[in-house]
């Protein structure tokens, strides 16, 4: 696997509106900001409860960035692109990060 590739796991509960919104938001963010450098795995905790238990998922939706390290989690609303990217410690290519001046 490409070392620059971002590996995400999105834990959802069934086919609820909230689950569908989380899926749509994550794919939108990835397509707009990560190009083709991502892989998203969708895990329904109703169908795969053991996976949720292994990752200690208590609330859905939960998004986990598996790779690259460090592992990061976001829980709940994922509609704000900037908050999601910052929460996952991801800086998209071409984004100009301004550091505060002394």
From Swiss-Prot:
Coiled coil: none
Keyword Nuclease attached: no
InterPro entries recorded: KaiB-like (IPR039022), KaiB_domain (IPR011649), Thioredoxin-like_sf (IPR036249)
SMART domains, per database record: KaiB
Keyword presence, rRNA-binding: no
SUPFAM superfamilies: Thioredoxin-like
A single GO BP: rhythmic process
Main function: A paralog of KaiB1, the major clock oscillator protein in this species. KaiB3 and KaiC3 may cross talk with the core oscillator. The monomer reduces the ATPase activity of KaiC3 by 55%, the homotetramer has no effect.
Listed name of the protein: Circadian clock protein KaiB3
UniProt organism field: Synechocystis sp. (strain ATCC 27184 / PCC 6803 / Kazusa)
Lineage: Bacteria, Bacillati, Cyanobacteriota, Cyanophyceae, Synechococcales
């Amino acid at each position: 696997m490409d070392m620059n590739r971002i590996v995400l796991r999105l834990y959802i509960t069934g086919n609820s509106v909230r689950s569908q919104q989380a899926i749509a938001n994550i794919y939108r963010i990835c397509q707009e900001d990560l190009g083709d450098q991502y892989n998203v795995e969708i895990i329904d905790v109703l169908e795969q409860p053991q996976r949720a238990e292994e990752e200690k998922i208590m609330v859905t939706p939960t998004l986990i960035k598996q790779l690259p390290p460090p592992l990061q989690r976001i829980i709940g609303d994922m509609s704000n692109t900037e908050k999601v990217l910052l929460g996952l410690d991801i800086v998209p290519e071409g984004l100009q990060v301004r550091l505060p001046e002394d």
